[in-house]
């Protein structure tokens, strides 16, 4: 079962396998390494992204390949400390008065110290976005576990681009690639 193979392995093992495969194919002139949607299985908090095991390991990889930029898929979490900043997809933290949102994200790790995060804008109905949330949210606990997050993910209405020294990249995550309007502009499309 592909869901068991991907989502039942611990995040360190999956990352180590990804890095091992990458090292066998990288050289000093490689400028971009791509990882697929949800390649990073670690729960990555955006406010502490540089403390993430996965980001540290990918930074170590970059130290061996100084021109390398990395675009990789991940599930990221954003802490919301103000009740006024909550969204319709925000979830309450257990035992705390804070909320958070979960995103299907593309993380761009520059060859410098910068890290940019793109949040998927077009969510898959029924999988990443529950229709009629007030009516259907109580049913989330009955959803089939396919290795992901139950309930609606957060989204942004921003169509970010990432830049390397000689290229502009517009990441599209999975289902977004069917939306032609997301691909406009003077950028190279990369679907993860």
Give the predicted meaning of each segment:
Residues 137-141:
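Short, basic/low-complexity N-terminal boundary segments at the transition from targeting/disordered tails
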Residues 1-126, 161-166, 171-183:
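Soluble catalytic regions of membrane-associated enzymes that act on cell-envelope
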């Amino acid at each position: 079962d592909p869901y068991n193979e991907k989502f039942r392995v611990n995040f360190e093992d999956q990352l180590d396998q990804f890095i091992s495969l990458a090292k066998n194919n990288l050289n000093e002139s490689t400028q971009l390494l791509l990882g697929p949607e949800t390649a990073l299985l670690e729960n990555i908090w955006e406010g502490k992204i540089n403390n993430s095991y996965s980001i540290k390991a990918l930074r170590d990889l970059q130290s061996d390949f100084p021109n390398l930029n990395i675009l990789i898929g991940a599930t990221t979490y954003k802490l919301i400390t103000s009740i006024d900043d909550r969204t319709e997809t925000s979830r309450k933290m257990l035992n705390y008065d804070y909320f958070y949102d979960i995103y299907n994200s593309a993380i761009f790790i520059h060859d410098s110290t910068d890290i940019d995060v793109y949040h998927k804008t077009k969510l898959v109905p029924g999988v990443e976005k529950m229709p009629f949330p007030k009516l259907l949210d109580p049913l989330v606990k009955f959803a089939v576990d396919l290795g992901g997050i139950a309930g609606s993910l957060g989204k942004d209405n921003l169509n970010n681009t990432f830049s390397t020294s000689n290229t502009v990249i517009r990441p599209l995550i999975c289902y977004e690639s069917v939306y032609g309007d997301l691909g406009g502009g003077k950028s190279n499309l990369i679907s993860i």
